[in-house]
Amino acid sequence: MSATIGSAASGVNEAFRRCLSAARLRRFPSKHPRNASFPAAGALPIVQGMNIVCLLGSPSEPSRSAGLLDHARSLLEPHATRIDTIRVRDLPAEALLHARFDDPAIAAVRKRIHRARLVIVATPIYKAAYSGLLKSLLDLLPQDGLAGRTVLPLATGGSPAHLLALEYALKPVLAALGARDIADGVYATDRQIERLPDGRHRLDEATEARLARIVGELVERLAPQRAGARLPAELRWAL
């Protein structure tokens, strides 16, 4: 597990809990009276056996895409048994540049993705496309390398003009790798992610709320799948 993000993530977690509660109220409005009392949102079930792999495609350190990924991880950590972050910049450059499929480090990445239930892909957007560093790794995955996995795309860029790169550049490649369950992505501009003096990052309110909503929906959807059965009503309402 990664180190605790700290106080900067506390607001994200609170927004996450509010979004989870609101999502359940919208989904089952007729089954409970308005004044019914429900379990606290903090009672979310731990998703036993859910492995998560994060692919960070930023060539820079530190980076805002890493900060966005860190916040997503902090929301998911209570609901996963393992989260691994693969920083593509730390993989052997020669293996990436020369497309060495048999390199041990690349083979290890493929194995970790194969064991994952959820794959998070985080990248900066350069010239209306995801990073070339990320592309060099995706090219070394098998054609069905993301089949059967839920994928959450995250991206950062200099301006709102790059927002469409998430939909028209990154998501089609993920689909070409077999991903059929691609969550709504989160895109944030540099102005929406503040870099703090201690190296952490703080999201603005809109980005924080969107990330909390999307991650909350993922937890709600994946928890019953991993448990192998529908959650009891009291736990479903805790979501």
Show which residues each predicted segment covers.
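Short, positively charged and aromatic/hydrophobic N-terminal segments
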Residues: R24, P45-I46
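N-terminal beta1-alpha1 ligand-phosphate binding loop
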Residues: M50-H79
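Glycine-rich phosphate/pyrophosphate-binding loop and the adjoining helix
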Residues: I182-L239
